[in-house]
Amino acid sequence: MKPDTVSLTRAFSKATSTSSKAALSWLKKYNFDYDVAYTKWIQQKSREEAEKQLNNVFSQFSSKEDKDLIELDGSVQLFTALDISLEDPETLLVSYFLKSPRMGEFHRESFVEGALNLSTTSLDQLKLAIKEKVQVWRSDASLQKAIYIYTYPLACDKGKKTLSTSIAIEFFQILLKDTFPLLDDWIAFLKVSPIIEKSLPKDTWNELWDFSVFVKSDPNCSNYDFEGAWPTLIDEFVSYYREHGYKNSSS
């Protein structure tokens, strides 16, 4: 090694309490730019410490049979620790940010990654971060849409890729009550449609968000385009609404 390389390696080894071999390897990654290498080292060590703390948080709620999984009972305990009732819509927000694959289930790696993304390392910090996100959720349309889209696979039963319409209605009432002016008409339509006995297609679920935005500026659906790319079920709803809902609301 060149003299300057030797001195850099020696200095880095001393500063980071690592072997000369490890110091040399790390410096090489950053072309022997000491400041960059040291900054990256500190960042990595900070992340490793944060991951360790969050793994400990996860372990408080993990299953005895599978330490990398939080199941329903553990999820109840987690929500309780976060001061969130199981009936609260906030459970969906927590599930979204902690990357739950389905209701009442969290996986260690995804949980830790999600908590890190919230800049938290402890349960108390996580509780505060969630409270802050709840406030954002109430007014941030992009976050509202993201959680809405995320909820469809979250609410599906394990091993299933589709959501029953009856269950979908329950989530519509939670997620769209303040954003979809025709929610009551939509639910009334679903209950008399053959779809009530079937699964609601995912694309219909997703497109309903955009439709809810559309009707805010066109509550009578006067400019609705039946030749557009809307799902068939929404076409059928608009026809139903013009015959039943709009007629009733204008009388």
UniProtKB/Swiss-Prot annotation:
GO biological process terms on file: protein neddylation
Sorted UniProt keywords: Ubl conjugation pathway
Record domain DCUN1: where: 49-242
InterPro entries in the record: DCN-prot, DCN1-like_PONY, PONY_dom
Keyword Membrane applies: no
UniProt-listed Gene3D superfamilies: Cullin, PONY binding domain (1.10.238.200), EF-hand (1.10.238.10)
Record-level GO cellular component terms: cytosol; nucleus; ubiquitin ligase complex
Protein name from the UniProt record: Defective in cullin neddylation protein 1
Organism: Schizosaccharomyces pombe (strain 972 / ATCC 24843)
Organism classification: Eukaryota, Fungi, Dikarya, Ascomycota, Taphrinomycotina
